[in-house]
Amino acid sequence: MPTVSALRASLETYRGLGDRPADFGSFWRRRDAAAEACAATSTATELPSKNLLAAYSRVCVASTDGRPLAIRVIEPCTPGPHPVVVMFHDLGRGARGWHHMTRFVALGYGVVALEARAWSTDVTEGWELGPRGLAFTQVIDDALVSAHLALSLPWVDASRVVTWGEGLGGALAIDVAAVLGKRVWRCAAANPMPADFRGAWESGFEKGAYAGLRTHFRDVDPTAARADELFSALAYVDAMFFSPALESRLLVGVGLDNDVSAPSSQYAAFNRATCEKALISYPKWGHERINDFEDELLGFLNDRQADKSAV
């Protein structure tokens, strides 16, 4: 078993398996345009929790497939414009509570948090139809709609938009920031997944966002005869192929003792990013909320560099 130092050293240069599809950028530009159009029409319901610091509302907006999305919005009560954190939650967990999200108001931030729709959580769903048929493509579409909603809010400082998420939400934070380019100021992700689908499969990761791969290669393609076709479709929703397009600053936290989101795949997404970036790894932490990283996030949002740079 490798030492922590040896593991870190090997991960620092790992870039994952496979190549970015040639039409990846144009594919997501088209979908982003559709997401932006959806965000232009929404209905907000104000909640009775307003206080001296913040006002709360739930916004309903149709996604690119016409299905309704619910998005939580917290607006600081002090005069704007305000920076905003666009939040995405992990697989199997709901959006964070209003009380938790209100902490960002202390830093002067508003919050826009997508309540992700129910879906199968099988990343292979729809693969036979190519990237347009993937259920996870729609998940990313939904995330883009929520980001465009944030950009459209009159109190938001459009020059200080942050994407942030954990686990699946971490990958969505990277994906959205990559598609929006210069429109995102900061991007932070903890234990982001999925990324490096083929690498995760080859390494035997079969939990979380990768669980569908095990089922697929047991029930649908037991000899892996069509593996290349599957991974060609999944390349369009792979955070590892979004990250090279990032133009924001990037902060990533990785629990090295993670048996749900492959540390190697997380590093692959980070290592392919060419923007200003920092990664903090935690040898004895797994796929869980890491308090130390949340402290680093606080500093990242407070416009200072993360004070650790170990990878």
Each model region followed by its residue ranges:
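Short beta-strand/loop motif that positions the catalytic acidic residue
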Residues: 246, 252-254
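Hydrolase active-site cap/lid region
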Residues: 175-224, 281, 289
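C-terminal catalytic histidine-bearing segment of alpha/beta-hydrolase fold enzymes
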Residues: 267-311
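Gly/Ser-rich "nucleophile elbow"/oxyanion-hole loop immediately N-terminal to the catalytic nucleophile
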Residues: 127-167
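Short beta-strand element of the alpha/beta-hydrolase
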Residues: 71, 75, 81-91
